[in-house]
């Protein structure tokens, strides 16, 4: 359980970092668009979204819901530092990378293969962290027992 909180804290911290990189001319704070695939691997995003008080108290950063599962406000302490738009993409990681290439997505939660493929083709993207590391190991252990 402690690992998931640390991963979520890292996720929110990465949003804080990106908040300074994206500008929206119509508001005082930037708007970040975060795309994800609807899998259990990206549940950490919604752990952060659904537990703002926990993360505010423990880490000083939190997401507050404006429209559940779609729009949030990112706070550092009591200061709003970004608007966060959450976009569910059901067509796979390549679709997310297409959106990123088009400038429609700022942060993405997806597997490595499409990221590596698009970076190899020239897309300006960086992997900043793993959100899960042990799921494959558990599956393989069960398959080969």
Curated annotation (Swiss-Prot):
The chain crosses the membrane at residues 4-24. The keyword Heme does not apply. It comes from the Archaea. One of its GO terms (cellular component) is membrane. Keywords: Membrane, Transmembrane, Transmembrane helix. It is found in: Membrane. It is a single-pass membrane protein. This is Uncharacterized protein MJ1180.
């Amino acid at each position: 359980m402690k690992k998931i909180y640390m991963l979520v804290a890292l996720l929110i911290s990465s949003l804080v970092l990106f908040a300074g990189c994206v500008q929206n001319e119509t508001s005082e704070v930037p708007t970040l668009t975060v795309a994800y695939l609807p899998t259990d691997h990206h549940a950490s995003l919604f752990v952060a979204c659904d537990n703002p008080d926990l993360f505010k108290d423990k880490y000083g950063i939190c997401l507050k819901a404006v429209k559940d599962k779609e729009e949030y406000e990112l706070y550092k302490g009591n200061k709003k530092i970004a608007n966060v738009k959450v976009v569910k993409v059901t067509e796979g990681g390549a679709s997310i990378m297409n959106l990123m290439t088009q400038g429609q997505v700022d942060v993405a939660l997806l597997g490595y293969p499409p990221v590596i493929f698009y970076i190899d083709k020239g897309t300006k993207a960086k992997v900043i962290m793993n959100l899960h590391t042990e799921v494959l190991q558990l599956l393989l252990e069960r398959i080969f027992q």
